[in-house]
Amino acid sequence: MVFGENQDLIRTHFQKEADKVRAMKTNWGLFTRTRMIAQSDYDFIVTYQQAENEAERSTVLSVFKEKAVYAFVHLMSQISKDDYVRYTLTLIDDMLREDVTRTIIFEDVAVLLKRSPFSFFMGLLHRQDQYIVHITFSILTKMAVFGNIKLSGDELDYCMGSLKEAMNRGTNNDYIVTAVRCMQTLFRFDPYRVSFVNINGYDSLTHALYSTRKCGFQIQYQIIFCMWLLTFNGHAAEVALSGNLIQTISGILGNCQKEKVIRIVVSTLRNLITSNQDVYMKKQAALQMIQNRIPTKLDHLENRKFTDVDLVEDMVYLQTELKKVVQVLTSFDEYENELRQGSLHWSPAHKCEVFWNENAHRLNDNRQELLKLLVAMLEKSNDPLVLCVAAHDIGEFVRYYPRGKLKVEQLGGKEAMMRLLTVKDPNVRYHALLAAQKLMINNWKDLGLEI
């Protein structure tokens, strides 16, 4: 099944499949006669199935005690038919959903056997049947969060790796919502957050976010919710800056109309600043937000009347913090010094809208001294990085200075830019092309705000 616009498909697929499993007619006697399961296993499962309510099921479990766990394990491991494994796992998941304190029965038996309670289920995560895999996620999540024994070591890494794989499949995974819901529960605990980010888990979440972009806002909200939970951990917040998380969720912030999605995106961005204890990493988080035009997007959102007090507070916090960074890191003196030394690099000023809006006209001071330096770099520099930044800056000058196009043409900048379109370096060609488009079009805004 491939998902389209109907978000209900991905929200209910697991539940619908579980309903089919619960309605299955079982014949446990067949497996007893062939000695695939013991008589004690048969006695328990039949008695448990006959229990009609929570109280009766609790009584059955208290009577059979450790025999109940042995029976569940034998039914999962000694019967090879997927439909019976599905049925057994569904019984266990329903049992734990009804009362999560029942996780202790697996823990008690595991202690007797000197093994982990999670080891009863770990082998099921590599099964081909995706219902089996995802209901196992559901069971392990309940045990790992509500039980007395927590996932750790190789078992934790294996579980997180399996969840990451589920995310990487995107909407090719009919059960993606189930996996996301498990992560929403697991990521409330620091060790689980750290384990996931240490295996590049963020990449799988951003992939899933892109993959589900046409599946409705609810699944997008849930995936970003997982990101938000991760960013409460300082290490996880730092790791997030090495990928494209900010770029991904900033795109959603600029396009989404749903308040709950906007709220979770803004809160995630705030966490990326507050959870990072290192001053340098805080600055890097702010820089990425500035480069992805978060200040501008927050300014646009101010026009909406949000009812959520926390959202408004988070927006004000971000605006305040980002303005501080802009003021410190995008001074024109810094930019001028960089330009005069001929050492152009991607410092914050180059991609900051506020900087260009306030300072583009200053390239004309002293008979266009600084603008001439930029054009000269296009003609004389052999450094691909310098050429990229110089081309970008000339494009921004044209974009923000009303007569910028004419000024650049008079200095020979247009011809120099066109020559860069034929150089070998693809990055230089890319930035030269963007700048050349701005030079040739009558109104640069026709190109769109994202250029």
Curated annotation (Swiss-Prot):
Record carries keyword tRNA processing: no
A Gene Ontology molecular function term of the record: proton-transporting ATPase activity, rotational mechanism
The keyword Protease is assigned to this record: no
PANTHER family in alphabetical order: V-TYPE PROTON ATPASE SUBUNIT H, V-TYPE PROTON ATPASE SUBUNIT H 1-RELATED
Physiological role: Subunit of the V1 complex of vacuolar(H+)-ATPase (V-ATPase), a multisubunit enzyme composed of a peripheral complex (V1) that hydrolyzes ATP and a membrane integral complex (V0) that translocates protons. V-ATPase is responsible for acidifying and maintaining the pH of intracellular compartments and in some cell types, is targeted to the plasma membrane, where it is responsible for acidifying the extracellular environment. Subunit H is essential for V-ATPase activity, but not for the assembly of the complex.
Top-rank taxon, per record: Eukaryota
Species, as recorded: Caenorhabditis elegans
Pfam families in the cross-refs: V-ATPase_H_C, V-ATPase_H_N
Cellular component GO terms held in the UniProt record: vacuolar proton-transporting V-type ATPase, V1 domain
Entry's transmembrane regions: none
Alphabetically ordered keywords of this record: Hydrogen ion transport, Ion transport, Transport
Name the record gives this protein: Probable V-type proton ATPase subunit H 1
Assembly description: V-ATPase is a heteromultimeric enzyme made up of two complexes: the ATP-hydrolytic V1 complex and the proton translocation V0 complex. The V1 complex consists of three catalytic AB heterodimers that form a heterohexamer, three peripheral stalks each consisting of EG heterodimers, one central rotor including subunits D and F, and the regulatory subunits C and H. The proton translocation complex V0 consists of the proton transport subunit a, a ring of proteolipid subunits c9c'', rotary subunit d, subunits e and f, and the accessory subunits vah-19/Ac45 and vah-20/PRR.
Family: Belongs to the V-ATPase H subunit family.
